[in-house]
Structures are given as structure tokens and as C-alpha cells.
């Protein structure tokens, strides 16, 4: 059934100061700047312990602005912000370098006339625990490999919603942890993301989820599901329970970025609502970024030229029902598609026309993930839709296939990608297979990922019909060539990286992956296997990577789900 209507709109012009004013007068600089250009601010980062320091993330935020620009110091300790990225004004400066704090508050005045200079002195930190990523906690904590695997190698682990620091700083006993683990199971995971800077929010699940949590003695899923009591007893040995004021293990850290990993500019824009939990984004042909909220009934856009956000409200759902939407897909006509939740835990496929602001829905097409296929077809899970007529053309499935391999099998929540022949493929996160369906015959086929129990997750199909995907518990990036039916895998630099989402290759052939455990964006050169890890300036969790279609220099966009920010990454090499 096709329904149409309209949504109400809220314009949210965020505090960008002169940038927004300039945009209104037609004089604003494009925040998608095409070339770094001359420096607005430069300096040297050093410490008494190391001298000039490489790999220190330096952050600059103008007073009153809603965005922060970050660069990384080079091998000589030098950092530089291009003038294209910093307007004149007073800026606060902060750093990220594990083991160090900035000596005193950092600030600088930037003018249009000359390059400002600010040398930064760092001191050894007195609170190393507050600086550790979840991966560094995993490296540090005591326990057997089996205990750590059961804690971390879960498709929805503690670090899916917050960092492991929260667990390690707790003082819960084993008995208290059992009740706490049960309470955590009552939250809707994709609608919950809580950062240490008080952004994001927790979202309770549906009543049936809450009831199931009370009855379930297990935390996690097979094959690594663990009895809550067993996990609770382990966690009570590594937190601050029993009157401990420090941890019974050495805190270990990752090396800071070096070489190519320092050649990047990262800009993060605060979303209007600090409690937004945005799962996905997609750019349209003009570069405008569209996003959804996983736990609120609205969707929005950000204009990268001005940094201004606009929100569009959606019909509410009854109390007790889950609100929000997950994936979002822009079609070839710049219409916006997303799965919207409705009363009774239902989902309807929704199309928004930005020109007319008309909303159309297709009932009976419910899924969580979207894809764009050949000829511009919209895919909602295994269902193919003609975007012009909004008619369902076909719906496929694999569950009744006669050739299903021995289980268990669990497709990753209706995620599909589509090759040039119009055939859909999906990761089987439970069985570690790639599932493909011939769109002409409806026949399903299964290919086992070379690494067992690798939990294949989100990815993209490229123009050569290669499906690039994350191996979440395999700590690898995988590629399945749908033409040759061959796999290739590339390992991450270290265990417990747990890559979540993988991009298609960029114009230089590089592939990117997100890691909420390491709080780094990973770049892979598939030809050599070389990996570059870009340090994200804040906590980091992103579910999808998109390329900007309008910039001459490579630009990646992501939603930082953990901190409710839109994030732009510009590799400089």
C-alpha cells in the first residue's frame, strides 16, 4: 500500500559564527575546501620526556562554533592547520596523545593577515586510565584468552554502546554485575550510545526484549555466549571492586600515529541534539549529507558548505514502541529513502522528496538496511523496489533454500549489497558465510568465509562486483569477488580491532574500515596489505563510510554514532 504526506521541518542553524553569516550573504568559504592551502596556524608539539613529538592530535575549536578541526604532528613535532579550515577568531586548543596532557589551557587568536603560531608543551598525565581506548583496556586487563574473547568478540559487546573504561572503573561485585548485565540487555543497542563527554543516550528496548533479558542466563551469542554469572565473576576481578583504588594490571597503550598516519585533517560537527544516536548517513549529488536518528522520530541533513543542520520530524510512535530509523539511501534523483518505525514495532519503507517535501511510504516492506542497485533500483533488504513507481518488483529469501549448509546461520539484519547483474549478497554473521541470490532464478548460494567464526559484517560492493566487508571477530577486512567466487582477506595490525564497516576502494584503490575498539579509522592498501591507522580525536563508533561526490580531493564522511557528530576525514597523501 502506497501512502503520501508531508513532514514538518525545523531549521537548526548552529553556532558557526561568521561562517553562517557569510553563507547568508553569499560570501562564505566552502567547508569542503578543495586544497589545504597556506597555514592559518602552526606550531611544534614537545615534551620533556620525548622532545619534539610525532603523532599528537591537535584540535582547534573557535569560540561559539559547533565544529572542531584536528590535525596530527609530523616526525619533527610540527603541526599545521590550513587557512581553508580555520576562519579568523579566537580558538581553544586541545590534544590527544595517550599518556600526555596539555600543559595549561591552550588558546590562540587567528587573523587573516598572517599565520598564527602556538607551540604546545605536554606533560605526563596523572590519569592514564581516562585516555585509554577500549582496545587498550583489552590489551591491559588480566585474564585468559578465552575470558577476553567472550568479553570482546560479541556482535553486541560492552564497547558497542560505550567504552570499556566504564566497566573497569566500576566497583560492582560479581553479584551486582549479574543484575547490571541483565539491565544492559534491556537496552536497544543500536539506539544506545553514550560517550564520556555526555553525548548520546540510552534507549530501552521493547517490552518483550526487557522480559527476555530477565529470563536469559546467557550474555552474548553462540559460539561465545557466556553465562552471566561467569562473566560477572571475571569482570569483578578486573574492575575496582573490593576496595581497590587501582587496577591489578599494568595499563598498556597503542603507539601513536607515524608517517602517513599523521597526514590527515579530521573535522567533527556537533549535531543539534546532544542525545542523537545516528546510525547512518548518505550524501546526495550536491554533497548534502542526510542522516537518521536510531531512537528519535526525525531525520536530518547537514549542508557541508555552511555546517547548518536541518531536521524533519516524523510521526510519533506510541509509548513503549521503538522510535527512529536506521539506514538511509539517496537514489539517483536525490530522493531520500529510509526504513521508518511505526506503531506495533513495524517498519515501513519511506521516501522523502527534498524538492516537494512530500513523504511516501510502502507498507509491507520492512527492513533495517538499504542499498542502491543497478539501474537505480532501491533495495530494502532482499526486496527490490522501482523508485519511479514505488512498486515492489521482487522479494527474495534464502531461509527455505534446499542447499543451506549446516548451521547456525544468522544474516546480519537484512543487510544486502547488489552487484552489476542485480544479484543481492549478504553477510551471514552467524555462520560466517556470504549468501548470494540469483535474481533471475531466485536460487541461493553460500560461500564460507575462509576465516571461521569471523562474523562478517557491513561492507560495500564496488564497480568490479567485489564485495568488501568487515570480519568483526576475525579482525580482518574481507573481499568476495562475485564474478570469480574467490575470497581474499587482510589481517588487522592487532587482535581485538574488531572492524565494523568497510568501504569500497577509493580512487587510489585504498579501502577503509571503522574500529570502535581502537577509536581509529583504518586504511588498507589491498595491493600490498599495508595498513595506516588514523587516530580519531574523540571516542569513535561509525557504522558506514561514504565518499563525498563533489570534492576533487578525497573526502570521507561518517556519522560518529558514539558522540552525535558528523565527521569529515581528509587524507592528505
Region spans (language model):
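Structural motif
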Residues: 44-53, 86
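A short, solvent-exposed loop/turn motif at the edges and junctions
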Residues: 63-66, 88-107
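Short, acidic Ser/Thr/Gly-rich low-complexity loop/linker segments typical of extracellular
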Residues: 63-80
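Extracellular beta-sheet/turn segments enriched in Thr/Pro/Gly and aliphatic residues
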Residues: 109-134
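The canonical Cys-X-X-Cys-His
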Residues: 154-165
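Beta-rich, blade/repeat-based domains predominating
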Residues: 274-286, 318-333, 364-375, 402-421, ...
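Conserved beta-strand positions in repeat-built beta-propeller and related beta-rich domains
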Residues: 289-295, 331, 336-344, 372-374, ...
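Blade-level signature of beta-propeller repeat domains, shared across WD40, Kelch, NHL, RCC1
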Residues: 536-573
Amino acid at each position: 500500500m502506497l501512502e503520501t504526506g508531508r513532514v514538518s521541518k525545523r531549521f537548526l542553524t548552529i553556532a558557526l559564527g561568521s561562517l553562517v553569516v557569510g553563507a547568508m550573504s553569499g560570501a562564505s568559504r566552502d567547508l569542503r575546501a578543495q586544497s589545504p592551502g597556506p597555514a592559518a596556524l602552526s606550531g611544534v608539539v614537545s615534551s620533556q620526556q620525548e622532545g619534539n613529538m610525532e603523532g599528537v592530535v591537535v584540535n582547534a575549536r573557535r569560540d561559539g562554533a559547533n565544529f572542531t578541526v584536528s590535525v596530527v604532528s609530523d616526525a619533527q613535532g610540527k603541526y599545521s592547520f590550513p587557512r581553508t579550515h580555520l576562519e579568523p577568531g579566537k580558538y581553544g586548543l586541545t590534544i590527544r596523545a595517550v599518556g600526555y596532557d596539555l600543559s595549561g589551557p591552550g588558546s590562540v587568536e587567528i587573523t587573516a593577515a598572517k599565520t598564527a603560531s602556538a607551540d604546545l608543551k605536554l606533560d605526563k598525565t596523572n590519569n592514564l586510565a581516562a585516555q585509554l581506548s577500549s582496545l587498550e583496556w583489552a590489551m591491559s586487563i588480566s585474564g585468559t584468552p578465552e575470558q577476553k574473547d567472550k568479553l570482546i568478540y560479541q556482535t553486541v559487546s560492552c564497547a558497542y554502546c560505550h567504552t570499556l573504561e566504564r566497566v573497569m572503573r566500576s566497583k560492582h561485585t560479581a553479584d551486582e554485575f549479574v543484575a547490571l548485565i541483565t539491565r544492559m540487555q534491556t537496552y536497544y543497542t543500536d539506539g544506545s550510545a553514550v560517550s564520556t563527554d555526555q553525548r548520546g543516550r540510552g534507549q530501552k528496548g521493547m517490552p518483550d526484549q526487557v522480559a527476555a533479558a530477565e529470563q536469559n542466563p546467557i550474555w552474548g551469542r553462540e559460539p561465545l555466549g557466556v553465562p552471566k554469572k561467569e562473566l560477572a565473576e571475571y569482570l569483578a576481578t578486573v574492575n575496582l571492586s573490593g576496595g581497590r583504588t587501582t587496577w591489578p594490571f599494568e595499563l598498556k597503550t597503542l603507539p601513536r600515529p607515524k608517517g602517513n598516519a599523521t597526514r590527515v585533517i579530521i573535522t567533527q560537527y556537533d549535531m543539534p541534539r546532544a542525545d542523537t544516536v545516528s546510525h547512518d548517513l548518505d550524501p546526495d549529488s550536491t554533497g548534502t549529507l542526510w542522516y537518521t536518528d536510531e531512537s528519535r522520530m526525525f531525520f536530518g541533513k547537514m549542508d557541508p558548505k555552511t555546517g547548518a543542520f536541518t531536521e524533519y520530524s516524523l510521526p510519533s510512535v506510541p509509548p513503549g514502541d521503538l522510535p527512529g530509523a536506521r539506514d538511509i539511501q539517496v537514489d539517483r534523483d536525490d530522493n531520500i529513502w529510509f526504513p521508518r518505525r511505526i506503531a506495533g514495532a513495524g517498519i515501513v519503507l519511506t521516501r522523502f522528496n527534498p524538492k516537494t517535501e512530500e513523504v511516501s511510504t510502502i507498507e509491507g516492506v520492512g527492513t533495517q538496511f538499504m542499498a542502491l542497485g543497478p539501474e537505480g533500483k532501491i533495495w530494502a533488504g532482499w526486496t527490490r523496489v522501482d523508485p519511479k513507481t514505488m512498486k515492489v518488483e521482487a522479494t527474495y529469501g534464502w531461509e527455505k533454500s534446499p542447499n543451506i549448509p549446516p548451521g547456525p546461520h544468522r544474516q546480519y539484519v537484512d543487510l544486502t549489497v547488489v552487484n552489476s547483474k542485480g544479484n543481492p549478497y549478504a553477510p551471514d554473521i552467524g555462520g560466517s558465510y556470504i549468501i548470494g541470490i540469483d535474481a533471475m532464478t531466485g536460487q541461493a548460494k553460500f560461500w564460507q568465509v575462509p576465516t571461521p567464526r569471523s562474523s562478517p559484517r557491513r561492507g560495500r560492493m564496488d564497480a568490479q562486483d567485489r564485495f568488501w566487508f568487515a570480519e568483526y571477530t576475525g579482525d580482518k577486512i574481507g573481499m568476495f569477488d562475485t564474478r570469480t567466487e574467490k575470497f581474499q582477506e587482510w589481517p588487522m595490525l592487532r587482535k581485538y580491532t574488531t572492524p565494523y564497516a568497510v568501504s569500497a576502494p577509493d580512487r587510489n584503490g585504498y579501502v577503509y574500515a571503522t574500529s570502535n575498539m581502537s577509536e581509529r579509522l583504518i586504511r588498507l592498501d589491498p595491493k600490498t596489505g599495508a595498513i595506516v591507522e588514523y587516530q580519531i580525536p574523540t571516542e569513535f563508533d561509525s557504522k558506514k563510510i561514504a565518499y563525498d561526490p563533489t570534492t576533487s580531493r578525497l573526502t570521507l564522511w561518517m556519522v560518529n554514532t558514539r558522540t552525535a557528530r558528523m565527521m569529515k576525514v581528509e587524507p592528505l597523501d
